[in-house]
Amino acid sequence: MTRSEGDTWNLASSVGATATMVAAARAAATRRPRPVLTDEYAEPLVRAVGLDVFTKLASGELDPDDLERDVGFARMVDTFAARGRFYDDYFAAAGKAGVRQVVIVASGLDARPYRLSWPAGTTVYEIDQPEVIAFKTATLSRIGAAPTAELRTIGIDLRQDWPAALQDAGFDPAQPTAWLAEGVLIGFLPPEAEVRLLDSITPLSAEGSRFAADYGSLNDASQASTEQARRTTEGWRRRGLDMDIAALTYPGKHTDVAAHLGADGWATTTFGLADLFAAAGLPELTEAEQGPAATLSFVRAIKS
């Protein structure tokens, strides 16, 4: 089903299923002999969602190589592991710099407030759909997981007035903040909503604040991209999952996040997927392994 303004989803459908896919990839990466990252909460969260293909991937029942070939997404597990590690390292650097206020927008099934070692005095704010927040909180509570920082959750759609809800939860715009928008600005919001998100973050960011995100579009409407999306969608359907990649993203020219932040006074550094693989110690992607994420950019920024 094509995305529309104000649409809704859960973790088993539409864009929500991509959050479950990413968590399943983190669980699969955690099982490897020398994992790029360790996320012990990914598998129980994926199991609780109940999508068969992702449960099998997370549990080790399904060979990642077989799945990646079938859906046309080479090195999918490595890609999401490298991305996750990139942002884990970003938060570690922010903590060492003295930042004690963190905001994760559209957090999905990410469990960083539980799995990372945060400096004493850190408060983490998570923003996502109310149903997603409730599901994740309840699932982690059932398995006895406890946050490693003070955690405050805000159940609200990013297309609504989330800045007011964030401040109502105790967020202090006078304090430096480490922001993360992982997997958000890659076509899952309308272009105008991307701009609103960035324009809302800047005035809430004191000097010394940091921002990290990936950006671009998984489906740029080119013939090659359209064909890739078709093959991937057919692959997921063969695995019993109705996830139409092209229909998940909004059309239009999406935001150059680094340029937008730079114009607003942020000092930005951009990276490609190859940089993330190198930083994680993973073998580089071959020409044949260039998948949907290879066209994305990654940014880290500091507010001066």
Swiss-Prot record:
Membership in a protein family: Belongs to the UPF0677 family.
The protein's name: Putative S-adenosyl-L-methionine-dependent methyltransferase MAP_0882c
Keyword Chaperone belongs to the record: no
Alphabetic keyword roster: Methyltransferase, S-adenosyl-L-methionine, Transferase
Function, as annotated: Exhibits S-adenosyl-L-methionine-dependent methyltransferase activity.
Positions annotated to bind S-adenosyl-L-methionine: 128, 157-158
InterPro entries linked: Ppm1/Ppm2/Tcmp, SAM-dependent_MTases_sf, SAM_mthyl_Trfase_ML2640-like
Protein EC: 2.1.1.-
Organism listed in the record: Mycolicibacterium paratuberculosis (strain ATCC BAA-968 / K-10) (Mycobacterium paratuberculosis)
EC class: transferase
One Pfam short name: LCM
GO biological process, one term: methylation
